């Protein structure tokens, strides 16, 4: 049974069962269609009544379809029904009030002066610009392509000219066919096997039971945002020959505004502005300054005096603001189909990925919070913390030269407890969980992306052959070769020239990485010098917490250096990328992205790597300290360990960076737009209110970043790395990332809707090179977390002590009772008389016992001074080292095996999606066969009419 194009009536779907059971629009006709044998008894009166009711609904449907556009791709289908009145009603109402329809349309700045032709694109130039001849040729060729054009001067600056462009139906149809724009041709009809009929009845009963339950608060309000999903129609590449197969109820709204702008931009990219084979395209005119700006229009104001619930949305921008960019809907799902319709697939995919990433952070944040709370609840039962807090008789050696005093181990009680919050028995489990989480996140994102790509008609979409960058063309215009794709001659870059440029670029990257290392070295020197300064500070609070004060100030200085170097790195990455001379814009974008990510990743994480793996590891021991340039003694860890320094580094950097990024994303455009409005008020006086048309309002907004979505993706990718790479040391990182992303989604939405010009609706199948970077970060996170657990934390030393040296040695137990004596076993003894002259402290320690101290303790596994080999490594040191190396190997192999197993078990495409794709392919082929059959029948009729004989190929 073939599905007709009117398969959806009043929101109810026609469902066919292969064995013959039929559901029509919610009317139950439980009769079997038996191909053979006697017919079943049927109550024809009930069928007749059902058919009469169906006929009424069909008439209502046709009346609605005549008044409004198609519910599949109509650009106004998401607006409030109250705004979808007929044109004749609008005209009569407006004429009664003394206003005509053209005047109404003209006043909102979205149409030409006639009020009928919608503005699809805006070009801006200055009359004082000397490139007049190029513009005239370009605009003459624009008219030759069939585009309509009008010009308007600015209300505040007569030197600024706005060129309004409109694409008629004939132009849109011609280029939509060339661009393979997919349009709706048939509503979707889902075939259900007979065996699922019983389950569908159960689902209906469950849905009735759920009616009294509260609605899902995260779902968008259907009254405000009806028909959210745009996947209720099958689509096919548009063809003017098969135009009658497509669902067209209104030619003006058949192509939505984003598609119209994309088609116009496609035309502008192929129009010549000067004689010559390479003098073509709008991008080159923007580069040489002939035009100052080019952008599609926003669809009116994003604010309204009336409530959206009572009066409906005035336009899609207003609808996006109320349902997406407003802070009041921060907890609701994103209207991704509306975002895609307004901004295009590329921006829609970014917000889909960001929303998916944020949603996947919920389990990671919950488990991380659980690990932290587990540390809180087990704090009083931690044997290690108890021993540190009760060790009033253990005197620790000074942590710096001269000015640092001796201190009791019990003075580190608070730091030992804080360390236990992050370094406890659940840390290893959380590290394994996060490694698996990263894999699951990426695998399920591939499935989610596939569903989005299908719903948004991106499955079979392929990027067009890209144009050559003007810079590449100007550099290599003298050397040409034949393009194997287009068959046309094009500029060519020699292999030797390309290699030499890549070598220079790689050298520049290496040099900038050395600059980062130098900055880290400067931070290390600052920490070494400052700890002694703070130890001699006159304020007791700072003097007694000199190491914490040193770490805190060093992190803040490091953050400032990071932000300053980011500005430098952007300029260097731009210089090196231009030096490479990439051939196309996508090659340029990928090269620039890779450099910027590498620079910023190293810049952001270099100090963190130093604290995690080098701080306190190569300091020597009292009496034989290692020094920088034979002068500065390397910094030691706090008596409670180095993990607290790593936690402070990650927490401060993460909070400060996310706060700064959010301010720059929203605050900077707000300040710029406020400054623009302020200049206008100063020029025209505050008492004069000017009503700007939409094109001038949009021109005064900030243009989208020159690098597109690069900054948005980079911020989130760096956050993903910060969340996964050192998560074993900071379990609260996913929670901070989740809170930030909830704000980030609405900030980005607000910025796109209110502060930026409307970007061109670009298409993309995926998130591009960023997916490969995410996979690389996932692999790196496994390695770093293995090293953090084995090297930075005390998990392995505690485990070795419990099974080998503690009270439970040889018994196979590792509880808290087995940790008795661990603190004493992890500290070595040093004879104070063995201090070097420049390391000997000013105090002799008599304030502790009334007599000068003879011995002090330090963190290490070394022999006492009276042994055969003074201060040599003990056997326990080698056992701990072997256990650490073994843990790294076992942890990495185990987690990588789990990651690969998960990747293998999770298919990239859901099964139902594969079936839907096959169904759509079948219907498209059927449509083509029907069109071909109609053509042949038409030819046969014409031949019979003309009396010409024809040859039958098939019997």
Curated annotation (Swiss-Prot):
Extracellular side: 1-352, 446-505, 569-595, 737-768, 907-955
GO cellular component, one term: plasma membrane
Residues that span the membrane, as ranges: 353-373, 425-445, 506-526, 548-568, 596-616, 716-736, 769-789, 886-906
Cell compartments where the protein resides: Cell membrane
BP terms from Gene Ontology: calcium activated galactosylceramide scrambling; calcium activated phosphatidylcholine scrambling; calcium activated phosphatidylserine scrambling; chloride transmembrane transport; establishment of localization in cell; monoatomic ion transmembrane transport
Region entry Disordered, spans: 72-100
Location, primary (coarse class): membrane
Domain of life: Eukaryota
Metal-binding keyword on record: no
Glycan attachment sites: 83, 105, 257, 288
Entry GO MF terms: chloride channel activity; intracellularly calcium-gated chloride channel activity; phospholipid scramblase activity; protein dimerization activity
Cytoplasmic membrane side: 374-424, 527-547, 617-715, 790-885
Catalytic activity: a 1,2-diacyl-sn-glycero-3-phospho-L-serine(in) = a 1,2-diacyl-sn-glycero-3-phospho-L-serine(out); a beta-D-galactosyl-(1<->1')-N-acylsphing-4-enine(out) = a beta-D-galactosyl-(1<->1')-N-acylsphing-4-enine(in); a 1,2-diacyl-sn-glycero-3-phosphocholine(in) = a 1,2-diacyl-sn-glycero-3-phosphocholine(out)
Keywords: Cell membrane, Glycoprotein, Lipid transport, Membrane, Transmembrane, Transmembrane helix, Transport
Membrane topology classification: Multi-pass membrane protein
Pfam families: Anoct_dimer, Anoctamin
Purpose of the protein: Has calcium-dependent phospholipid scramblase activity; scrambles phosphatidylserine, phosphatidylcholine and galactosylceramide. Does not exhibit calcium-activated chloride channel (CaCC) activity.
Remaining remarks: The term 'anoctamin' was coined because these channels are anion selective and have eight (OCT) transmembrane segments. There is some dissatisfaction in the field with the Ano nomenclature because it is not certain that all the members of this family are anion channels or have the 8-transmembrane topology.
Similarity field: Belongs to the anoctamin family.
Record-given protein name: Anoctamin-4
């Amino acid at each position: 049974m073939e599905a007709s194009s009117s398969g959806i009536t009043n929101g109810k779907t026609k469902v066919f069962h292969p064995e013959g059971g039929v559901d029509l629009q919610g009317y139950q006709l439980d009769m079997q269609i038996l191909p053979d044998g006697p017919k079943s008894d049927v109550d024809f009166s009930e069928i007749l009544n059902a058919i009469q009711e169906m006929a009424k609904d069909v008439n209502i449907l046709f009346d609605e379809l005549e008044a409004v556009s198609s519910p599949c791709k109509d650009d106004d289908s998401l607006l409030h029904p109250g705004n979808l009145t007929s044109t004749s009603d609008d005209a009569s109402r407006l004429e009664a009030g003394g206003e005509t329809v053209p005047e109404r349309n003209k006043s909102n700045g979205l149409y030409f002066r006639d009020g009928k032709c919608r503005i699809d694109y805006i070009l801006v130039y200055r009359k004082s610009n000397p490139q007049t001849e190029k513009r005239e040729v370009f605009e003459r060729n624009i008219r030759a392509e069939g585009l309509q054009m009008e010009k308007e001067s600015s209300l505040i600056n007569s030197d600024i000219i706005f060129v309004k462009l409109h694409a008629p139906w004939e132009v849109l149809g011609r280029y939509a066919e060339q661009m393979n724009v997919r349009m709706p041709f048939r509503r979707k009809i889902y075939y259900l096997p007979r065996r699922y009929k019983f389950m569908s009845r159960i689902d209906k009963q469950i849905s009735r039971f759920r009616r009294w339950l509260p609605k899902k608060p995260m779902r968008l309000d259907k009254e405000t945002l009806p028909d959210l999903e745009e996947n209720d129609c099958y689509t096919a590449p548009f063809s003017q020959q098969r135009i009658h197969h497509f669902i067209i109820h209104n030619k003006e709204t058949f192509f939505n505004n984003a598609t119209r702008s994309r088609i116009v931009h496609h035309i502008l990219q192929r129009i010549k502005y000067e004689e010559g084979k390479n003098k073509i395209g709008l991008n080159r005119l923007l580069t040489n300054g002939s035009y100052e700006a080019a952008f599609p229009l926003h669809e009116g104001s994003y604010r309204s005096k009336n409530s959206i619930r009572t009066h409906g949305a005035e336009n899609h921008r207003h609808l996006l603001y109320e349902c997406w960019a407003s802070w009041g809907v921060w907890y609701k799902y994103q209207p991704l189909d509306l975002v895609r319709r307004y901004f295009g697939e590329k921006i829609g995919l970014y917000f889909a990925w960001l929303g998916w990433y944020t949603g996947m952070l919920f389990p990671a944040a919950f488990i991380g919070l659980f690990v932290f709370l587990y540390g809180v609840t087990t704090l009083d039962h931690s044997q290690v913390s108890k021993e540190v807090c009760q060790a009033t008789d253990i005197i620790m050696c000074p942590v710096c030269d001269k000015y640092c005093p001796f201190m009791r181990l019990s003075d580190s009680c608070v730091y030992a407890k804080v360390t236990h919050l992050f370094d406890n028995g659940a840390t290893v489990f959380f590290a394994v969980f996060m490694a698996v989480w990263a894999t699951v996140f990426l695998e399920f994102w591939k499935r989610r992306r596939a569903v989005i790509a299908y719903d948004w008609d991106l499955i079979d979409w392929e990027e067009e052959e890209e144009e050559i960058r003007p810079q590449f063309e100007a550099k290599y215009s003298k050397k040409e070769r034949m393009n194997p794709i287009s068959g046309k001659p094009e500029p060519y870059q020699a292999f030797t020239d390309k290699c030499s440029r890549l070598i220079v670029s790689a050298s520049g990257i290496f040099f900038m990485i050395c600059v980062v290392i130098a900055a880290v070295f400067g931070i290390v020197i600052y920490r070494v010098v400052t700890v002694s300064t703070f130890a001699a500070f006159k304020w007791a609070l700072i003097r007694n917490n000199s190491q914490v004060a040193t770490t805190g100030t060093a992190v803040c200085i490091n953050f400032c250096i990071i932000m300053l170097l980011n500005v430098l790195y952007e300029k260097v990455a731009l210089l090196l990328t231009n030096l490479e001379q990439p051939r196309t814009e996508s090659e340029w974008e990928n090269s620039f992205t890779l450099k910027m990510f590498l620079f910023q990743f190293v810049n952001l994480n270099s100090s963190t790597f130093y604290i995690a793996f080098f701080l306190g590891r190569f300091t020597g021991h009292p009496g034989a300290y290692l020094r920088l340039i034979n002068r500065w003694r390397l910094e030691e860890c706090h008596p409670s360990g180095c993990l607290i320094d790593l936690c402070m580094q990650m927490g401060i950097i993460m909070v400060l960076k996310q706060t700064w990024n959010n301010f720059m994303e929203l605050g900077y455009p707000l300040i710029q737009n406020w400054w623009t409005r302020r200049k206008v008020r100063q020029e025209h006086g505050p008492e004069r209110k000017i009503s700007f048309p939409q094109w001038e309002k949009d021109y005064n907004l900030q243009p989208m970043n020159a690098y597109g979505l690069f900054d948005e993706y980079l911020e989130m990718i760096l956050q993903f790395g910060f969340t996964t790479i050192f998560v074993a040391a900071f379990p609260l990182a996913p929670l901070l990332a989740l809170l930030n992303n909830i704000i980030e989604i609405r900030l980005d939405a607000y910025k796109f809707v209110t502060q930026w010009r409307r970007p061109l609706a670009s298409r993309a199948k995926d998130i591009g090179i960023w997916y490969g970077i995410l996979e690389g970060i996932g692999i790196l996170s496994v390695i770093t977390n293995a090293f953090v657990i084995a090297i930075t934390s005390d998990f392995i030393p505690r485990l070795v002590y419990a099974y080998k040296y503690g009270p439970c040695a040889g018994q196979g137990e590792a509880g808290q009772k087995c940790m008795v004596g661990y603190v004493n076993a992890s500290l070595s003894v040093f004879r104070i008389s063995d201090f070097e002259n420049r390391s000997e402290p000013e105090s002799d320690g008599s304030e502790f016992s009334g007599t000068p101290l003879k011995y002090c303790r330090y963190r290490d596994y070394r022999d006492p001074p009276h042994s055969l080999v003074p201060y040599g490594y003990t056997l326990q040191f080698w056992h701990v080292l072997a256990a650490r190396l073994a843990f790294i190997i076992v942890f990495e192999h185990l987690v990588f095996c789990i990651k690969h197993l998960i990747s293998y078990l999770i298919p990239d495409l859901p099964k139902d999606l594969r079936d839907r794709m096959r169904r759509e392919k079948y219907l498209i082929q059927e449509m083509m066969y029907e069109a071909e059959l109609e053509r042949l029948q038409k030819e046969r009729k014409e031949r019979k009419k003309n009396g010409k004989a024809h040859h039958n190929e098939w019997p």
